[in-house]
Amino acid sequence: MELIFLGTSAGVPTRTRNVTAILLNLQHPTQAGLWLFDCGEGTQHQMLNTAFNPGKLDRIFISHLHGDHLFGLPGLLCSRSMAGNAQPLTIYGPKGIREFTETALRLSGSWTDYPLEIVEITAGEILNDGLRKVTAFALEHPLECYGYRIEEHDKPGALDASALKAAGVKPGPLFQDLKAGKTVTLNDGRVINGADFLAPATPGKSVAIFGDTAPCASAITLAKGVDVMVHEATLDTSMEEKANSRGHSSTRQAAQLAHNAEVGQLIITHVSSRYDDRGCQRLLAECQAIFPATALAHDFAVFTV
């Protein structure tokens, strides 16, 4: 998987950072997919500066209905129709996402010429496509807000064809069942368990993408043990009380959560527009003092999971 940050600013854009939007390129050899997490104003314009086509998006996950995470959605939906050949799209988000989307399209005389499904979610598993699952966790913010945990299923180990041949099992249709870990009966009556001839499974990758939040009880479960955690760091540690009062987190709190949840890497984003480049580096240093494996996202930054 690959994360591409299209916008990393909190609340309003700056000259160098747009508001929140993150692409997740699934990069699966047999079932590719392009997912978008949040869609702040100008997201479709940001995508023009990447190699990715909005028409290829197949799922959009909205964390909450604040404008800096949402106002780019109607325009993106319409542009997909104007460009043509857009594939079916499913939007996930909190209660109100359907009314917002349908009202924006209706009042502007707009429409979509591709299948569009809107799913209003609650906390819990919201998607399992056989290759990965997505679980939504309620966060602490003035509006109903969610974070998303994306987990690939473990990849089955390779079938040891040499060992099977040594056991007298010839290559053929049975190999598919054995590769799936099934038990098969040979013509001579022998019973072969495919699991005995498989290499260990490769653990799937996992990502936790937080919406806006103050520290909350669900955060540790959302992030526990993931390879990459994407979390807001709206304000520095000295402004922690102000951040929390508005449903946001400080650098220290993001880093401490990453440490407690034992994640592989922390990527901080959603940085207040009050910070220039030097200020952003100070935010990064505050996080790294607690959790060294921290990176600071900037617009168009790409991270491999």
From Swiss-Prot:
Its cofactor is Zn(2+). Binds 2 Zn(2+) ions. It holds the Pfam family Lactamase_B_2. The active site is at D68 (proton acceptor). The keyword tRNA processing applies. Its EC number is 3.1.-.-. It is an enzyme of class 3 (hydrolase). Zn(2+) 1 binds at H64, H66, H141, D212. Zn(2+) 2 binds at D68, H69, D212, H270. NCBIfam families: PRK00055.1-1, PRK00055.1-3, RNase_Z, true_RNase_BN. Zinc phosphodiesterase, which has both exoribonuclease and endoribonuclease activities. HAMAP family: RNase_Z_BN. Belongs to the RNase Z family. RNase BN subfamily. Homodimer. This is Ribonuclease BN. The lineage of its organism: Bacteria, Pseudomonadati, Pseudomonadota, Gammaproteobacteria, Enterobacterales. The gene is rbn.
